């Protein structure tokens, strides 16, 4: 039989960090580090323009603002469907970036209660790829 996961009252909040380094015009090294309370997380890189568009939509569209009063939670919603899911520290080179472009690396951690009931705060790390 299939069992639904149990809910842990007062479970500690999940958090994570994102470090950006080794930038080239088309690549970036990202190190995602979850804390001990994080059982998994979603990550992605958005252009800074796309990231700001999502925040602005959450601030200005009443139907979205009602569901996501914190605009960053709207980004977390997209990460669940668009992002990569990880369970431990990841150190990766992201490729096929555009030279001279502003990006926002984002991460949405979750605790033992899962993504729906245990999502932590959005982690962000802005960076710009060099022109050459």
In which residue ranges do the predicted regions lie?
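Extracellular fibronectin type III
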Residues: 1-9, 88-91, 110-132
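Proline-enriched interdomain boundary motifs that mark the N-terminal boundary
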Residues: 10-18
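Solvent-exposed loop/turn segments flanking beta-strands in beta-repeat/beta-sandwich domains
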Residues: 29-68
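Non-globular, low-complexity intrinsically disordered regions
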Residues: 65-85
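Surface-exposed, short loops/turns at beta-strand junctions within beta-sandwich domains
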Residues: 80-87, 93-102
